[in-house]
């Protein structure tokens, strides 16, 4: 079996070579029809667009994307061509929650906010949104949830409307998949009308997909003081992001909220597992991220400890200094571990 693998997917080489007769590694943007022509499977990230142009006439039978999102896969074409695929739902949910937790700590400190006086609106309550809700509850915030597909299945006891979130929330964070059309369309969900409906000058956070927020509408909301701040990890037209928006957001990062080593290891494992299931392979492998360079953290309180584990301002400063390096900063992202990798001392 021959597998073509995105060369930025970590911790995969040894395991992949246990299940493949031949494994070829290439940059995600360089996957071509010629490269994939005689491959049985692909393991990709969002940079590889799997569509007719890439896949037609190839031997590819299965695509594993080491990501939660799958809008870079033309699922209709794959269905027609008999190509199956799998994503990695929930793989990096704890990583995104860590990013938002640290971002909120920075924001509340800079803006003198008391968490128990704040209301957060979480739009999209899947694997990530559910973990963010737990973070907010631990902070003592009031939590409002919006998830139309879940509300239709489960009823509206748990969920609320976008209108109520716009009226009552001090923090609004997006965790929806990107749907460009249909009943659950999320493309430009936050448009000019949405921003004009906001009542409390909230901080707006987007770690889902860039196209969920209309860039010009967000810029207008910042310029007109409709929102107090923005924390943006995902952008329209990546990697050619809007430089003016980058300059004006509180925190702007190169699509790395889910890039903890733990989340990457989960995604790698899930991708390999899906290939083994599809091809009926039996393989034993371990996907273990490296230990942090300083696993012992000394801090006077939990908030200090969390920011020592991960401070998104560092990632933001790098991108703001070199926006032209968006792809490089994302592809060569330094080791970041989640809380379970650390021991904390000094908290009384």
Swiss-Prot record:
PROSITE patterns: D_2_HYDROXYACID_DH_3. It is found in: Cytoplasm. It catalyses: 4-phospho-D-erythronate + NAD(+) = (R)-3-hydroxy-2-oxo-4-phosphooxybutanoate + NADH + H(+). CDD domains: ErythrP_dh. It comes from the Bacteria. The keyword Oxidoreductase applies. Homodimer. Belongs to the D-isomer specific 2-hydroxyacid dehydrogenase family. PdxB subfamily. This is Erythronate-4-phosphate dehydrogenase. It comes from Bacteroides thetaiotaomicron (strain ATCC 29148 / DSM 2079 / JCM 5827 / CCUG 10774 / NCTC 10582 / VPI-5482 / E50).
């Amino acid at each position: 079996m021959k597998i073509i693998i995105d060369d930025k997917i970590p911790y995969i080489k040894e395991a992949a070579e246990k299940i493949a007769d031949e494994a070829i590694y290439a940059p995600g943007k360089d996957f071509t029809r010629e490269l994939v022509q005689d491959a049985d499977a692909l393991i990709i990230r969002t940079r590889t667009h799997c569509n007719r142009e890439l896949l037609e006439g190839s031997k590819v039978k299965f695509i594993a994307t080491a990501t939660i999102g799958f809008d870079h896969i033309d699922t209709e074409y794959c269905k027609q061509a008999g190509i199956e695929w799998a994503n990695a739902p929930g793989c990096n949910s704890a990583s995104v929650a860590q990013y938002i937790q640290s971002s909120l700590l920075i924001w509340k400190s800079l803006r003198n906010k008391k968490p128990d006086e704040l209301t957060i609106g979480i739009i999209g309550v899947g694997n990530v949104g559910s973990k963010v809700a737990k973070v907010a509850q631990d902070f003592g915030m009031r939590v409002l949830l919006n998830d139309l597909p879940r509300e239709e299945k489960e009823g509206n006891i748990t969920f609320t409307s976008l209108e109520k979130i716009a009226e009552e929330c001090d923090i609004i964070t997006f965790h929806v998949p990107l749907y460009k059309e249909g009943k659950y369309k999320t493309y430009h969900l936050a448009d000019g009308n949405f921003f004009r409906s906001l009542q409390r000058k909230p901080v707006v956070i987007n770690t889902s997909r860039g196209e969920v927020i209309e860039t010009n509408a967000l810029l207008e909301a910042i310029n007109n003081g409709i929102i107090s701040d923005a924390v943006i990890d995902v952008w329209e037209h990546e990697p050619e992001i809007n430089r003016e928006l980058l300059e004006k957001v509180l925190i702007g990062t190169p699509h790395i909220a889910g890039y903890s080593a733990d989340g990457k290891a989960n995604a790698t494992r899930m991708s390999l597992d899906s290939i083994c299931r599809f091809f009926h392979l039996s393989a034993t492998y371990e996907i273990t991220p490296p230990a942090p360079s300083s696993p012992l953290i000394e801090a006077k309180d939990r908030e200090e400890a969390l920011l020592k584990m991960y401070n998104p301002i560092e990632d933001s400063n790098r991108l703001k200094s070199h926006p032209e390096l968006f792809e490089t900063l994302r592809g060569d992202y330094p080791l970041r571990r989640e809380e379970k990798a650390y021991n904390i001392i000094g908290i009384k």
